[in-house]
């Protein structure tokens, strides 16, 4: 089971979820161990600059939407971290951060 599987399942039911991601790729916006509250979202409902829980090439990230392309069910988003890295394009967006409580 992956670090965010439980949150992804909760978001899929239409409920909010809380995660505590670890790592430094989103500093200073999200610090390692922060409590992040997510609301359900998908690629069509997020905008550039949103912090989202998503899957890119089989990996789950809590990263930024860097760009969008397309519309409706064909819309996809470019995901990257807060330090200049880019993960790639995806349609697999599960949630958007609505509250971040850094330690």
Protein language model regions, located:
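Extended hydrophobic leader/signal-anchor segments used for secretion and membrane insertion
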Residues: 1-103
């Amino acid at each position: 089971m992956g670090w965010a599987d439980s949150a992804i399942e909760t978001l899929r039911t239409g409920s909010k979820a809380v995660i505590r991601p670890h790592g430094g790729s989103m500093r200073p916006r999200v610090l390692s161990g922060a409590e992040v509250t997510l609301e359900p979202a998908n690629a069509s409902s997020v905008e550039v600059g949103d912090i989202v829980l998503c899957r890119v090439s089989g990996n789950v990230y809590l990263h930024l939407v860097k760009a969008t392309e397309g519309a409706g069910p064909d819309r996809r988003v470019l995901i990257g971290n807060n330090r200049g890295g880019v993960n790639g394009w995806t349609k697999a967006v599960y949630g958007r951060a609505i509250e971040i409580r850094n330690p």
